[in-house]
């Protein structure tokens, strides 16, 4: 079996990306359904998430990297109802070296590299 090439990235705020990479956060809540069932890059958006989760991770607000692709995760399922969907995540992998995307990030999925 050949390894599937990753072509998509999902934009998520910190500290939620860090929570996914640590295996703490296994569901991403979105207003849109997704039919994607594959490994995607995790892009840490520039806009921060809720500060209370930084404390739960034991890190200072603003101390986690943003504007970079920090890892990958598999989207394995999507459940819910219109306006409130749960994207089920599995098998997060942290990149040894974060990557700056070549293309401008979008709110949900985007193709980060010119291929």
Residue ranges and their predicted role:
Residues 2-115:
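Structured alpha/beta reader/binder surfaces that contact nucleic acids or chromatin modification marks
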